[in-house]
């Protein structure tokens, strides 16, 4: 241990121990933690237990706001540890609660054991602990590249926030006005509870965002060639299941002039 290598190993072990204690004590992210309140909970659509829920959260004064496309770690009162969810609203889009608290929207789809229990366990007035925001899935790209947005299933949530930020009166900067094309993959367009809102946001955006919908129930599937219909080099922004993301990643490694930005669904 007296040798330089031993001193280095000892220092690294000490730093690792401190980091482990810091993590186990729950101090990571503490400066970004906010105790909010559920303002409302509502089921979207008529898909029964498979319907996503919209959770509106009222945030405390410590909340410093967010950028479109960011996510947060959420721990609902009486449930297990924190889970990541994308903020599905643009900054200031929902205004404030009657108490003057800033509001944000979460759209949660029942994809697993935990999320399937939330419709029965969440209610207005309940405490919610939110850590964040995190991430840079902001749709900012070069004006020399065509912006192409690709969403599948609940992966549409960051794009709802990006599109909401492009609505009249909410646009805040150069990145909001960069022309983009939207591609949305869904199991069944006829029963998709988020599609109507997506269509309205695309149509009313400034500038409008052309939307292509691929409904699996109608035999429609997205291919890389569909994305390459846009001329020139592409900035591809993708959020959705890992399989489709991997396919796009493999294609982006080829000769196509793609730059792929990908929001991961595998983080826990």
Describe each PLM feature range.
Residues 156-173:
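Histidine-anchored nucleotide/phosphate-binding helix
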Residues 146-150, 235-237:
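Conserved beta-strand elements of the Class I
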Residues 141-145, 231-232:
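Short helix-loop-beta connector
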Residues 1-34, 166:
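Anionic-ligand-binding alpha/beta catalytic cores of soluble enzymes and soluble regulatory domains
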Residues 72-75, 123-124, 164-169, 197-201, ...:
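Short, solvent-exposed amphipathic alpha-helical segments in soluble enzyme
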Residues 69, 155, 240-241:
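Short, conserved phosphate/pyrophosphate- and ester-handling motifs at nucleotide-, phospho-/glycolipid
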Residues 22-129, 138, 147, 179, ...:
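Ferredoxin-reductase
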Residues 1-17, 113-120, 179-268:
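Reductase modules of NAD(P)H-dependent flavoproteins
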């Amino acid at each position: 241990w007296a040798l330089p290598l031993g001193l280095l190993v000892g220092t690294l072990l000490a730093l690792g121990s401190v980091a482990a204690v810091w993590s186990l004590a729950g101090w990571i992210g503490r400066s970004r933690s906010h105790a909010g309140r559920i303002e409302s909970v509502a089921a979207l659509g008529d898909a029964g237990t498979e319907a996503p829920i919209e959770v509106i959260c009222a945030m405390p004064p410590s909340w410093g706001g967010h950028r479109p496309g960011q996510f947060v770690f959420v721990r609902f009162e009486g449930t297990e540890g924190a889970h990541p969810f994308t903020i599905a609203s643009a900054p200031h889009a929902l205004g404030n609660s009657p108490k003057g608290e800033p509001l944000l929207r979460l759209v949660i789809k029942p994809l697993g054991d935990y999320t399937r229990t939330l419709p029965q366990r969440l209610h207005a007035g309940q405490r919610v602990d939110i850590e964040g925001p995190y991430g840079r899935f902001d749709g900012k790209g070069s004006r020399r590249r065509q912006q192409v947005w690709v969403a599948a299933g609940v992966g549409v949530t960051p794009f709802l926030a990006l599109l909401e930020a492009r609505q009249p009166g909410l646009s805040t900067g150069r990145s909001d006005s960069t022309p983009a094309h939207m591609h949305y993959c869904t199991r069944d367009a006829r029963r998709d509870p988020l599609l109507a809102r997506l269509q309205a946001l695309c149509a009313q955006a400034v500038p409008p965002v052309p939307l292509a919908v691929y409904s699996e129930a109608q035999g429609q599937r997205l291919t890389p060639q569909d994305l390459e219909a846009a001329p020139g080099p592409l900035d591809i922004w993708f959020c959705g299941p890992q399989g489709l993301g991997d396919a796009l990643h493999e294609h982006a490694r080829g000769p196509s002039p793609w730059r792929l930005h990908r929001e991961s669904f595998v983080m826990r």
